[in-house]
């Protein structure tokens, strides 16, 4: 068929024979040029889209920071928390996360006692306060109403939990850590185990394990799920903005 077309065209327009001979090669070149142009445009679109979502996440964090008021009482404990965080986590410690955690636990009121008996700035239950020195001797004798002990114990206990959980990113890993601080490491492990049986990614907290309940009461489940979200997605940004130290960035999953 192609041969007959070439013969007919060549007999009618003799000068077109060479052009016809080169036509398949030109079509192939045009195809690949179009293909790579499409790839380049898709890549540019992806990068622009990723930048948009990262910028959106950052701006949302700033918006949340504007909604959060740091209690005046926090200032007197700022230096103590920074020292405790650096001693346990190093100089790049996510101080803003720990500050937001204390904010969430007690609103920086050292004399706070919850309805279930949790005590002090970091709201340690008496049993947990007694147990902690057995796995972290550096915390010393339990003293939940002593601000120095309480803030040091919070940083140490967070690190102990952090070393026993996993996540796809530091942001996800800290969410698991905070859930364990609030409700116990055993519950986190049970939630992750159930997530695996449901085909849910057990190394991802937000939008994954946070939706899985291995048996907690509705009230306990709701409180536990709000805890990492309030700290990581809202309150830490107020402390970052106020210059307390670094936090942990929300990595956008595309």
Which residues make up each language-model segment?
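Non-catalytic cell-wall polysaccharide-engagement segments
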Residues: 9, 14, 25, 33, ...
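Internal/C-terminal transmembrane anchor helices
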Residues: 45-52
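Peri-catalytic and regulatory segments of divalent metal-dependent proteins
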Residues: 77-89, 112-113
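Cell-wall polysaccharide-cleaving catalytic domain and substrate-binding groove, primarily
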Residues: 103-128, 132-134, 184, 231
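N-terminal intrinsically disordered, acidic low-complexity segments at the extreme N-terminus
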Residues: 2-21
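Short, charged helix-capping/linker segments at alpha-helix termini
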Residues: 85-93, 166-169
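Extracytoplasmic
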Residues: 93-97, 103, 116-119, 174
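Extracellular/periplasmic catalytic domains that process cell-envelope and extracellular macromolecules
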Residues: 90-94, 221-224
